[in-house]
Amino acid sequence: MGCVSMTLGIDEAGRGCLAGSLFVAGVVCNEKIALEFLKMGLKDSKKLSPKKRFFLEDKIKTHGEVGFFVVKKSANEIDHLGLGACLKLAIEEIVENGCSLANEIKIDGNTAFGLNKRYPNIQTIIKGDETIAQIAMASVLAKASKDREMLELHALFKEYGWDKNCGYGTKQHIEAINKLGATPFHRHSFTLKNRILNPKLLEVEQRLV
């Protein structure tokens, strides 16, 4: 087993949302296992139906030869630390936990946040979720986690359409924020920066009990 090349792929979901958490996931496996998932219909998670994403998420998490990590950064953390800092911290946590399992580390996007100085085997790949199976697998875990969170929050705040828009700034979502104000799960740094709401919190704490 020592000579089998293992790749750690990393991707995120929820980066550009107005509401909910950022999820960053990492998946470690060899090329043979990656091929198994490609045969199951694995591709960039944005091109998969929610049903297929949840199916693949279960297969990834229950496969005996796949290592995985999922890190969540809440809207509150994003407001206090900034999106870039949260993304870096989450990627750093995954790399620190997964680096001993992998020969190569591949991150979707164009920045390694300076971590390649400490981990020279890091490679950044733009649209990596379309070309690297392990990044696509990480993309599935991150997006399924984000979908699940927003479906749960939708049960508390149906007016914002989170079951459909997943927290992104759609016309309906922005109109709901303008009309009703923000919830405790909105990223106030995002919504205020975009000047789409009054700085008032919705009186909804009783719904959280």
From Swiss-Prot:
A divalent metal cation binds at residues 11-12, 108. One of its GO terms (biological process) is mismatch repair. The keyword Membrane does not apply. Its EC number is 3.1.26.4. It is an enzyme of class 3 (hydrolase). One of its GO terms (molecular function) is RNA binding. InterPro entries: RNase_HII (IPR022898), RNase_HII/HIII (IPR001352), RNase_HII/HIII_dom (IPR024567), RNaseH-like_sf (IPR012337), RNaseH_sf (IPR036397). The keyword Cytoplasm applies. It comes from the Bacteria. Endonuclease that specifically degrades the RNA of RNA-DNA hybrids. This is Ribonuclease HII. It comes from Helicobacter pylori (strain J99 / ATCC 700824) (Campylobacter pylori J99).
